[in-house]
Amino acid sequence: MNSFTLDEIYVGQKASVTKTITRGDLYAFAGLVDDYSPVHIDKAFGEQSPFGRCIAHGFLSGALFSTLAGNYLPGAGSLYVRQSLNFLRPVYAGDTITATFEVVKKGEEVTKPDGTVKFSPGRIVMKA
């Protein structure tokens, strides 16, 4: 776990975290947020959906930004106060995704990171 002070953070600084999404993650996240939509957890329903199989909840991928802020950049003691996401592609069980923050602006009290989630390696799944 990192713990950067505002003085230590610089524009262009990056942090990334990689996770392989499992079927277990889909069920665990559904239980955590009480969202049992069949497109996320029902195999037969997922196969009949436009996606062809179950997809991860968008915020399961988006939660990696909280992981980045709390553990890597800036790390311990940071407050994650705002998030705006664009979901560009579905994420399936078995996909490995990488979330990345890059500091694009630094103020006197806060920094503004840009974030992306990509398939590892590959196309962008989500932008923040």
Go through each PLM region and give its residues:
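Catalytic strand-loop segment that frames the active site of acyl-thioester-processing enzymes
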Residues: 1-54
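HotDog/MaoC-like acyl-thioester-processing domains
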Residues: 1-11, 91-128
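A generic structural signal for short beta-strands and their flanking turns/coil linkers
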Residues: 11-13, 17, 25, 35, ...
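Sparse recognition of residues in long alpha-helices and their boundaries
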Residues: 28, 45, 81, 110-111
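Glycine-centered flexibility motif
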Residues: 31-34, 67-70, 107, 115, ...
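A broadly tuned preference for mixed-charge, low-complexity surface segments
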Residues: 41, 66-72, 114, 126-128
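Hydrophobic beta-strand-centered segment that forms part of the acyl-chain substrate-binding groove
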Residues: 47-56, 60-105
